[in-house]
A protein has these predicted regions:
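Iron-sulfur cluster-binding electron-transfer modules in prokaryotic oxidoreductases
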Residues: 1-245
């Protein structure tokens, strides 16, 4: 869990947006956090980054005020629910909507998935009610075939919640997070048809339509991090971000 030793607020002056990745993504997939923030800043340079626990209401409000009260870009349904319930005055938008708006997507992916989305509950407001459609659009824009949710699906589950991905994988179900597809990295690479730099969509304007360069063997899946590894991930993530930005 993010605490005072692993918290970070990056941004100067009045920012239009602030990316709030949340504990689960930072602990489990720190490289995706870096990639996501980089792709957001590439589109809008006045995008800040806030690595705080969403439950630290006072710290979140202080950071939000310091950055000029930006719109918060969320990728975690649990964070969205908390913001909607405890911080309803802070404007939020889902990361998946912003990725679609900016035209950011990953490379070719012809895998079949069972869509398993988390809405975040009643407190999440519109951020993830609207963002749910963007998850499907992102996957389909990469060539994935989506199937309705069902128990014990023969296809790997595609989720928008890292905690749900971990729970499914721990129960011996195949599962991947949508950001693993977009950025071509993560603990579920066994389902990625090819691996190449998905950093910015402008570098892949043809979206691999010819299939050239998209062949290859998927990498074996990485094990889910244990508690010590998750803590180390947080500490290393903060260090890397401070060096980069």
């Amino acid at each position: 869990m993010i605490d005072s030793n692993t918290s970070l607020v990056l941004g100067e002056g009045k920012c239009r947006y602030a990316f709030f990745p949340g504990c689960f993504l930072c602990e489990n997939e720190p490289e995706i956090v870096v990639k996501a923030y980089d792709s957001l800043r590439f589109q809008k340079t006045d995008t800040a980054l806030v690595i705080l626990h969403c439950g630290d209401i006072e710290d979140v409000e202080t950071a939000w005020d310091k950055l000029g009260q930006p719109e918060m870009i969320l990728c975690c349904p649990r964070c969205a629910e908390f913001f909607g319930r405890e911080l309803p005055h802070i404007p939020v938008v889902s990361l998946y909507d912003k990725l679609m708006e900016y035209g950011i997507s990953g490379g070719c992916n012809s895998v079949d998935y069972c869509l398993h989305e988390t809405s975040g509950g009643a407190g999440a407001g519109d951020a993830f009610a609207e963002g749910a459609g963007a998850v499907a659009e992102l996957a389909e824009s990469m060539g994935a075939t989506l199937h309705p949710h069902e128990e014990n699906s023969p296809f790997p589950y595609l989720v928008n919640d890292i905690a749900v991905r971990n729970r499914l994988k721990s129960s011996n179900h195949d599962a991947a997070h949508i950001l693993e597809l977009v950025y071509g990295m993560g603990a579920s690479n066994t389902h990625l048809i090819h691996e190449h730099d998905h950093e910015h969509n402008h570098e892949h304007e043809d979206n691999c339509g010819t299939g050239s360069g998209c062949a290859g063997q998927p990498e074996p899946p990485q094990p889910l991090p244990d508690e010590n590894r998750r803590r180390a991930n947080l500490e290393e993530l903060v260090q890397v971000l401070q060096m980069l930005y």
